[in-house]
Swiss-Prot record:
PANTHER family: 30S 40S RIBOSOMAL PROTEIN, SMALL RIBOSOMAL SUBUNIT PROTEIN US4M. CDD domains: S4. PROSITE patterns: RIBOSOMAL_S4, S4. Pfam families: Ribosomal_S4, S4. This is Small ribosomal subunit protein uS4. Gene3D superfamilies: Ribosomal Protein S4 Delta 41, Chain A, domain 1 (1.10.1050.10), RNA-binding S4 domain (3.10.290.10). Part of the 30S ribosomal subunit. Contacts protein S5. The interaction surface between S4 and S5 is involved in control of translational fidelity. The gene is rpsD. It comes from Clostridium botulinum (strain Eklund 17B / Type B). One of its GO terms (biological process) is translation.
Amino acid sequence: MARYTGATCRLCRREGMKLFLKGDRCFTDKCAFVRRSYAPGQHGASKKKMSNYGIQLREKQKARRIYGILEGQFRTYYEKAEHMKGITGENLLKLLEMRLDNVVYRLGYGASRNEARQLVTHGHFLVNGKKVDICSYHVSMNDVITVCEKSRSSEKFKTFVENPKTLPKWLEANVDNYEGKVVAEPSREDIDVPVNETLIVELYSK
């Protein structure tokens, strides 16, 4: 599966805000954005007025980077969102939230979506009792996500039990059983990503 392999901190600097792509490090003074909050490159520190297209493009890039998705896959999600009932932009964010790697992150198993993606790829999770190692797997309401029995002795998952995360309303966790459950579809209020999805819709509608 294709993925971005460059410097993660450059992505935050390019978008002009913390995207929290490196988990706990983003909350420390080691965060590159704290030291250099301007865009990377020779002219990164200079201020330039952006066109409407540029603003829309940056919003789309920001969303892609938050969820760790390449352009082709992101457009596929958008096209699917267009054909769903409801508001296209909100549908897009809901589809992204219901990816297995994002649900694993929301449940608190990974400090970042990137870490959650690695945990899924390495086969640490079951969905409804069956192993799933595909990050883009779309979870549905009432799906149960469980840590594999053999993975539970890992310090990573022990931390989950000892320090459970506050969950969004659409998820529940049974910490003692190393499992989480999707109890509803996320509403727009439940999705705390700093993205204006209307700008993304405007971009793709051109």
